[in-house]
């Protein structure tokens, strides 16, 4: 029995079972269940944009105005609430978001476009990547022979002042503050008939790298603007380390430091004016750090 005969036999059996009526079997089309999907153009709000100083999560506080007044004095996480022994979901999410911002700032780099826009002289320490930078701080203080020649060729020998910008532990700090603080420093220096020319930008920068730059350039004063280690309050805080005739291996006490430079701390414009005054005092007294007091 071939396939055609088998097919005819099956059709005959089906005809007998249906009472002799021949029916054309048509596969039933699947029914469509219509599900309307609503697509919105909205976006999830950025939880990090909420001003912690104005946020009070305590329900029905006894002195709401007093609580908010206290919060205006500090970015600390006051006025939180809980569910049993645990923080509320919003508080946990904000904590994790701020921590993520801090991590991103450490592992990201200052934009190359910004370095070009500001006409910085780019150099790199002996660190090859972020992992080596974080695990080998000693390499972040030194330059190889090639970088030494780049610094020597692009700076004025024995200048009164050499400005250095370093990414440090926060690229966000440099990108947020450098455009405001440099003009402020330059303007402040004009009051003392001082100026600076080419600015060195150090990638994978540790603070003592300014010491080797001081020895290479022979500058009287070296001022390093560097990103601070970010915290949960801000990732945009920058510091200025200033030293008179820095040398490799010198004591940390010879550095003068201005920290917490950002919009929520010491504004960069205000810090720039103070830095200019400090530089003038160092040149006048020929010292820095604790010796300047």
Curated annotation (Swiss-Prot):
One GO term of the biological process aspect: amino acid metabolic process
Q: Give one GO molecular function term.
A: cobalamin binding
State the compartments where it is located. Bacterial microcompartment
InterPro entries for the chain: EutC, EutC_C, EutC_N
Alphabetical keyword list? Bacterial microcompartment, Cobalamin, Cobalt, Lyase
The protein's role, per its UniProt record: Catalyzes the deamination of various vicinal amino-alcohols to oxo compounds. Allows this organism to utilize ethanolamine as the sole source of nitrogen and carbon in the presence of external vitamin B12.
Q: What is this protein called?
A: Ethanolamine ammonia-lyase small subunit
Q: Identify the species of origin.
A: Listeria innocua serovar 6a (strain ATCC BAA-680 / CLIP 11262)
């Amino acid at each position: 029995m071939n396939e055609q005969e088998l097919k005819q036999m099956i059709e005959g059996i089906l005809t007998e079972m249906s009472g002799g009526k021949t029916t054309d079997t048509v596969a039933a089309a699947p029914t469509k269940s219509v599900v309307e999907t609503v697509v919105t153009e909205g976006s999830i709000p950025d939880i990090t944009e909420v001003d912690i100083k104005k946020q009070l999560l305590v329900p029905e506080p006894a002195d709401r105005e007093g609580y908010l007044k206290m919060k205006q004095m500090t970015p600390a996480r006051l006025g939180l609430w809980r569910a049993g022994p645990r923080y509320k979901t919003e508080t946990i999410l904000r904590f994790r978001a701020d921590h993520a911002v801090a991590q991103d700032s450490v592992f990201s780099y200052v934009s190359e476009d910004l370095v070009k826009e500001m006409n910085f002289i780019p150099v790199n320490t002996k660190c090859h990547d972020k992992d080596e930078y974080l695990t080998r701080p000693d390499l972040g203080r030194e330059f190889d022979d090639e970088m030494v020649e780049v610094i020597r060729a692009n700076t004025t020998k024995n200048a009164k002042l050499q400005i250095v910008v370093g990414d440090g532990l926060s690229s966000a700090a440099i990108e947020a503050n450098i455009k405001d603080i440099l003009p402020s420093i330059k303007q402040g220096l004009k009051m003392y008939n001082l100026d600076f020319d080419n600015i060195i930008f150090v990638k994978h920068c540790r603070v003592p790298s300014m010491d080797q730059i001081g020895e290479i350039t022979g500058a009287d004063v070296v001022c390093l603007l560097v990103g601070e280690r970010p915290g949960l309050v801000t990732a945009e805080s920058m510091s200025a380390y200033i030293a008179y005739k820095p040398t490799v291996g010198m004591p940390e006490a010879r550095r003068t430091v201005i920290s917490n430079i950002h919009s929520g701390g010491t504004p960069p414009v205000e810090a720039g004016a103070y830095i200019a005054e400090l530089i003038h005092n160092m040149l006048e007294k020929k010292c820095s750090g604790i010796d300047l007091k």
